[in-house]
Regions:
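Intrinsically disordered, low-complexity segments enriched in small/polar residues
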Residues: 52, 177, 212-213, 230
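Nucleotide-sugar donor-binding/catalytic module of glycosyltransferases
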Residues: 1-191
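Catalytic core of nucleotide-sugar-dependent glycosyltransferases
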Residues: 110, 179-219
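Membrane-interface aromatic/basic loop that binds lipid-linked glycans or pyrophosphate carriers
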Residues: 220-235
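Alpha-helical interaction segments
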Residues: 53-54, 205, 221-222
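Surface-exposed helix-capping loop/turn segments at secondary-structure junctions
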Residues: 81, 215-224
Length: 235
């Protein structure tokens, strides 16, 4: 495993060095640029590492014991029939609070999301369900993800490159990690009331502004007209 730190000011570096003493397989990428945020941080680290398969991990996630083996088994079944294709395997998550109390046992179910219905670029670009810390992807998927534009989240970028290249995204409808939702998340889930229609109606101005800002970003990826965006957003 490879670790990078984005410029922590607490005792994170000390914790990392303690892990290095415990396991010589861990590599600390200390020389990578700092204070660049999650998307550039993950992509920058990906660019430096050569492997057959890749997985991302956030520092406060709790991986369930079956996470790696389940993802690898599903990947291997796909790879046997598609040895040259970019492949992404990803899973559902359970959302928990700071003390690991469950807020959502299935994030997909809570959001009424069926990833298998969203596997084309027009949908995926506006509803990127492939969460980075659940993904396992191969070197072919890495290869087509560079050069990186620098303007999009790492999981969105890799997943949309795979779809655009006619690769394969496979969804596993089993939570494989506990996603910790707390006040210090750089990026967090919306859960409960914030996913409900009445909440969005009551906060319609924010919803519209958020969607307009998001459209401006994906337009840079040649998404198409705002009418197309609205059509796929409401379908």
């Amino acid at each position: 495993p490879y670790i990078r730190d984005d410029g922590s000011t607490d005792n994170t570096i000390e914790i990392i060095h303690n892990y290095l003493l415990l396991d010589n397989r861990i590599i600390f990428c200390e020389k990578l640029e700092k204070h660049i945020g999650p998307q550039k941080g993950f992509i920058g680290m990906l660019e430096c590492v050569e492997s057959e398969l890749y997985m991302f991990c956030d520092q406060d996630d709790v991986w369930l014991p079956t996470k790696i083996q389940l993802s690898v088994d599903v990947y291997n079944d796909i790879y046997v029939k598609n040895p040259c294709k970019p492949i992404v395997v990803h899973t559902d998550v359970a959302v928990v609070d700071e003390n690991l109390a469950v807020l959502e046992s299935s994030h997909w179910l809570s959001c009424r999301l069926n990833p298998d219905e969203l596997k084309n670029y027009n949908y995926l670009a506006i509803c990127c369900y492939t969460q980075g810390n659940t993904m396992l992807f191969n070197k072919e998927a890495k290869k087509i993800s560079f050069p990186y534009s620098g303007e999009f989240m790492h999981d969105w970028w890799i997943s949309t490159r795979v779809i655009k290249s006619k690769g394969i995204i496979k969804s596993i409808y089993i939570p494989t990690l506990l996603y910790r939702q707390h006040s210090n998340n750089v990026l967090g889930f919306k859960y409960g009331n914030s996913n409900r229609i009445f909440y969005k109606i009551l906060n319609i101005t924010n919803v519209i502004n958020d969607n307009l800002e998001f459209y401006k970003n994906i337009r840079k990826d040649n998404y198409g007209s705002v009418l197309k965006f609205v059509w796929y957003k409401i379908r």
